[in-house]
Amino acid sequence: VMERLGLGPDDCKAINKKLVYGRMTGWGQTGSLSHAAGHDINYISLIGALAAIGPADRPMPPLNLVGDFGGGAMFLAMGMCAAFFEAERSGKGQVIDCAMTDGSASLMTFFFNFMAQGLYKPQRESNMLDGGAHYYNTYETSDGKFISIGSIEPQFYKELRERIGLTDKEFCLLYTSPS
């Protein structure tokens, strides 16, 4: 669109050689989806984020923060900061292209790495960080609100058990990996 309006990176850099031109797309500048419309939910679905967490029977609606802000804006901002630094040093601007799918996929490397090692099961609610561990989850309270519990480390889990009076031996062990 910007190129059609005469405001593309080449047009603008002809006016200012130090210009840093940033643009963000969902799918990237090239490839089969480069001209397809989409939204954050589409981008993070394609890279596997919706399959990684949530209830076992369905993906949970995502926070748009993952695709739009985490996978898109933050990566674009980092690229632009590096380009500003380079433009100041060398006098040459550059074009920073950021695709939300690429940035979102990089945010998923923790899950992809653990899955590749057999340390993370593909079934939701069967892993420590996806609702499968009773000590890292959310629970409804008696007033209809929710509380989040995140007692992963042994010392915090021990304190949680002591404070709520959880003495059943079944709850004395922390999560162990499936391997």
State each model region's role.
Residues Y135-S177:
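Aromatic-enriched alpha-helical interface/lid elements that frame and gate functional surfaces
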Residues V1-G79, A83-R89:
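N-terminal helix-loop segment corresponding to the beta1-alpha1 unit
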Residues P9, V95, Y136-T138:
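Short, acidic/polar N-cap/turn motifs at the starts of alpha helices
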